[in-house]
């Protein structure tokens, strides 16, 4: 088993997960700011 396929999966995963977490945290912060 070679790990040569890991970067091709890990890079897009980080590129999708990191912005998703950022957008989610921003939306939660904005919603809490509007409620308070």
From Swiss-Prot:
Residues crossing the lipid bilayer are 10-30
Keywords, in A-Z order: Chloroplast, Membrane, Photosynthesis, Photosystem I, Plastid, Thylakoid, Transmembrane, Transmembrane helix
Pfam families tied to this protein: PSI_8
The record's SUPFAM superfamilies line, in alphabetical order, gives: Subunit VIII of photosystem I reaction centre, PsaI
Going by the entry's taxonomy, the superkingdom of the source organism is recorded as Eukaryota
The membrane topology term of the UniProt record is: Single-pass membrane protein
Homology family: Belongs to the PsaI family.
**Annotated compartments:** Plastid, Chloroplast thylakoid membrane
Q: Which GO terms describe its biological process?
A: photosynthesis
Q: What name has this protein been given in UniProt?
A: Photosystem I reaction center subunit VIII
| Function field | May help in the organization of the PsaL subunit.
> Got a GO cellular component term for this one?
photosystem I
